[in-house]
Amino acid sequence: MSRFKSDFLRTLDERGFIHQISDEAGLDELFAKETVTAYIGYDPTASSLHVGHLTQIMMLHWMQKTGHQPISLMGGGTGMVGDPSFKEEARKLMTIDMIEDNITSLKHVFANYLDYDRAENPALMINNADWLRGLNYLEFLRDVGRHFSVNRMLSFDSVKTRLDREQSLSFLEFNYMILQAYDFVELNQRTGCRLQMGGSDQWGNIINGIDLGHRMGTPQLYALTSPLLTTSSGAKMGKSASGAVWLNKDLLPVYDFWQYWRNTEDADVVRFAKLFTTLPMDEIARIATLGGSEINEAKKILATEVTAILHGRAAAEEAAETARKTFEEGALAENLPSIEVPTSELDAGVGVLSLIVRAGLASSNGEARRHVQGGAVKINEQGVSDERQIIGTGEVTGDGVIKLSVGKKKHVLVRPA
């Protein structure tokens, strides 16, 4: 029996999204009796988000699905300052044009999880630059700044960590906490927003906004955070051996995204199915009973369902079929990731280590060399034992490609161009 009566909090609870709530009973009552507006903030520091952001995105997804209104708040204003939370050094400052380009790109990612066009409870994307860029500094200090205690701000873990390490914390970054708190108050005044959600590392910042709202006369505001997500082996979500796992197919092919989830550790399959898919809980309970070799089927279901939300069902099933042909039939699948190498270079010959790095299967020649020495590298299914081997047009198959493999699960087609 769930401790919550509202559909939204009950869904988050049974799927493992909840770490901390500022007023559990009060927030549950609010969700049970009215349509609630809530937001999560994102600083547009890149043109795409990665899988480390998926927990919060899915919280917004479930909010809309249970009849409430989610806001994805773009930090067009705060992004010009940079969040100092648990960072070892100041972030590189971005121009307005860079930030706006990133926001445009991010909306395409969010649109796969949220519906901005529906008639009832449409999702909103709001840019805090709309109010932050026009602030009068003296009025802001007088009306907002006076509510903040520097002593208290210095006690926050995110600040203390920097200061304890004797790392510089600029006045610019220090202001970030005030601006983020003000966002909550401004959103309440503009949209009636009552809840801010985020990762557990944002708890202090969110409580700041609640306190500011109380001092400035808003209705009761609430905080809800999700746990810091790591794999069962302790690895942080969002990165793979080959780099960030982006939510933008221009940065990461659909097949690679699918494969990332297919490689989930056994102990994480059920937890990730709850968090990152919309599978019914009874279907997830069935998956939880799978063991032994059946766990691989569960991983394929997980990979296909997560990929279908982001890239569409057809693309997800195509990726699954590509994997099946590659691994189960040993066939050459045209939908494998590919790179182009000028024919002139192949005529002259390309070193295998260089080719591995260019294909994104290793980050350096040293890593590529270790793959060769470990017997993990194959060209057209033939093992490579010599790190000095030269790859040329002679290796191009009748299909017009060279299949480069590292291990059993990483394959790239090299196409002469």
UniProtKB/Swiss-Prot annotation:
Gene3D superfamilies reported for this sequence? HUPs, RNA-binding S4 domain, Tyrosyl-Transfer RNA Synthetase
Where is the motif ('KMSKS' region)?
236-240
Q: Which reaction does it catalyse?
A: tRNA(Tyr) + L-tyrosine + ATP = L-tyrosyl-tRNA(Tyr) + AMP + diphosphate + H(+)
- Where is the S4 RNA-binding domain positioned along the sequence? 350-416
Q: Where does L-tyrosine bind?
A: 39, 176, 180
Residues recorded as binding ATP, renumbered to this chain, are: 239
EC numbers listed for it are 6.1.1.1
Q: Name one GO biological process term.
A: tyrosyl-tRNA aminoacylation
Q: Does the keyword Protein biosynthesis apply?
A: yes
Disulfide bonding pattern of the chain: none
- Parts of the chain that traverse the membrane: none
Q: Which GO terms describe its cellular component?
A: cytosol
SUPFAM superfamilies recorded for this chain? Alpha-L RNA-binding motif, Nucleotidylyl transferase
Q: Which UniProt keywords apply?
A: Aminoacyl-tRNA synthetase, ATP-binding, Cytoplasm, Ligase, Nucleotide-binding, Protein biosynthesis, RNA-binding
- Ranges spanned by the short sequence motif 'HIGH' region, renumbered to the chain: 44-53
The entry lists its GO molecular-function terms as:
ATP binding; RNA binding; tyrosine-tRNA ligase activity
Give the InterPro entries listed for this entry. aa-tRNA-synth_Ic, Rossmann-like_a/b/a_fold, S4_RNA-bd_sf, SYY-like_C, Tyr-tRNA-ligase, Tyr-tRNA-ligase_bac-type, Tyr-tRNA-ligase_bac_1
Q: Where in the cell is it found?
A: Cytoplasm
Q: Which protein family is it in?
A: Belongs to the class-I aminoacyl-tRNA synthetase family. TyrS type 1 subfamily.
**What does this gene product do?**
Catalyzes the attachment of tyrosine to tRNA(Tyr) in a two-step reaction: tyrosine is first activated by ATP to form Tyr-AMP and then transferred to the acceptor end of tRNA(Tyr).
How is this protein named in the record?
Tyrosine--tRNA ligase
- Report the source organism: Agrobacterium fabrum (strain C58 / ATCC 33970)
